[in-house]
């Protein structure tokens, strides 16, 4: 791997694939294309001052990252194939053996899934953002066909011969394919004039970690509370859990103003102390993320493919935003690998196949998460009764439950 700052006005970089982004999805795409034999330029933002000093190694003594992902089997398979999964700090990865979804009201509904019923070893794996990115960075260091450029792009031009990204300072990166993996506010998407449907949920995800008095036994809990939003407690190694509270804006303001000890007490009451007393695990570390729905009108443009949040942003109540991104990367790699010999990796027909292959999966996940967010966000009593009855009914229909589990696991 070669790492450099933005090329100067006299520098024109050439590679098979240029990937814009600096998150786990961008790094996974870079690694995947490199391992498939393609030369790759990963265009990342300029490094922040002191970033190198902050990039400490993953140890048991390191504070637990409040940003975690519930990775499904598609993500696990892709990362294993790229030899990344084995590089994760296994002591900081927790398997989800079962999941319990709890309704609200006087007669709350319940829905339970477990790995045994799905005939798998785990439903998902909880991985910290830091742990994942450190493993990807380590793998990229040994990828000879990857060049990482730190700089800012200023424009994109594409033609039949390829696509060129112009850089601040006058340099450029030419490639056969440009991959936009630059997040929900994607610069690449905007440069390609791909419109979006945007809606705010007027909610924010409040995230932090706690230690718990009782063992969680690998169970992920989710509570649909109506007025207080959706609360998820995800298992971390040992007697630790990660909180993702999708709260209405007014409540999120209150939660962010409380001390973590006060938040722990509030959470214990809401969750009926299922895990016993909760104690702050990462002192003074709590973050919030605005929750929105973003539906781009296309996933591809001439010589350009979007992946991850650049291609779709969904409500986190199903925990599958990151998994959709990994599925995008897996599909793009497979589609490019299966192209006819005479076609370039950025050929319009190749990219159209990628977009078609991802359309249904993305649409269904957007439909499901948006529908659930709307259904469980209402306080109308008839709908509250109906949704709880629906949870109870679904729990008694094993065939449908198995299909839901298979889709959620990416199988």
Per-range role (PLM):
Residues 334-411:
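C-terminal helical "tail/cap" subdomain of flavin- and related membrane-associated enzymes
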Residues 26-27:
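N-terminal Rossmann-fold NAD(P) dinucleotide-binding loop
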Residues 59-89:
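N-terminal glycine-rich dinucleotide-binding loop that anchors FAD/FMN and/or NAD(P) in oxidoreductases
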Residues 253-346:
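FAD/FMN-dependent oxidoreductases across multiple families
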Residues 20, 34-65:
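Glycine-rich FAD pyrophosphate-binding loop
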Residues 10-23:
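Beta1/beta-strand and adjacent pyrophosphate-binding region of the FAD-binding site
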Residues 79, 164, 171-172, 178-279, ...:
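Conserved FAD-binding catalytic core of PHBH/FMO-like flavoproteins
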Residues 12-13, 86-191, 199-207:
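Conserved N-terminal helical subregion
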């Amino acid at each position: 791997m070669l790492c450099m700052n933005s090329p100067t006005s006299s520098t024109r970089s050439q590679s098979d694939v240029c990937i814009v982004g600096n998150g786990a999805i961008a790094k996974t795409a870079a690694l995947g294309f490199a391992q498939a034999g393609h030369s790759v330029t990963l265009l990342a933002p300029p490094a922040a001052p002191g970033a190198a000093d902050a990039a400490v190694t993953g140890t048991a003594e390191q504070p637990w990252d409040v940003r975690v992902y519930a990775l499904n089997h598609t993500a696990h398979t892709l990362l294993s194939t790229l030899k990344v999964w084995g590089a994760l700090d296994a002591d900081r990865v927790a398997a989800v053996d079962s999941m319990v979804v709890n309704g609200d009201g006087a007669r709350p509904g319940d829905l339970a899934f477990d790995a045994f019923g799905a005939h798998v070893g785990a439903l998902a794996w909880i991985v910290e953002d830091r742990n994942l990115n450190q493993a990807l960075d380590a793998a990229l260091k040994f990828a000879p066909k990857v060049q990482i450029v730190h700089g800012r792009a200023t424009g994109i031009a594409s033609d039949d011969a390829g696509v060129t990204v112009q850089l601040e300072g006058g340099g450029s990166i030419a490639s056969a394919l440009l991959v936009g993996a630059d997040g929900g506010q994607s610069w690449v998407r905007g440069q390609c004039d791909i419109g979006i449907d945007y809606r705010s949920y007027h909610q924010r995800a409040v995230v932090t970690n706690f230690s718990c008095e009782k063992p969680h036994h690998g169970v992920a809990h989710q509570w649909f509370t109506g007025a207080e939003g959706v609360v998820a407690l995800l298992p971390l190694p040992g007697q630790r859990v990660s909180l993702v509270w999708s709260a209405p804006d007014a409540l999120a303001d209150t939660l962010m103003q409380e001390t973590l000890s006060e938040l722990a007490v509030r959470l214990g009451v809401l969750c009926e102390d299922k895990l016993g007393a909760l104690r702050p695990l990462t002192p003074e570390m709590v973050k919030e993320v605005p929750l929105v729905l973003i539906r781009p009108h296309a996933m591809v443009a001439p010589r350009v493919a979007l992946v991850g949040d650049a291609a779709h942003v969904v409500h986190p109540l199903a925990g599958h935003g990151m998994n959709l991104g990994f599925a995008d990367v897996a599909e793009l790699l497979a589609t490019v690998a299966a192209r006819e010999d005479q076609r370039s990796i950025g050929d319009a027909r190749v990219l159209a196949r990628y977009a078609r292959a991802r359309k249904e999966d993305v649409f269904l996940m957007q439909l499901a998460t948006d529908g659930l967010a709307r259904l469980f966000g209402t306080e109308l009593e008839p709908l509250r009764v109906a949704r709880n009855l629906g949870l109870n009914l679904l729990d008694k229909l094993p065939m449908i439950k198995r299909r839901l589990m298979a889709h959620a696991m990416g199988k």
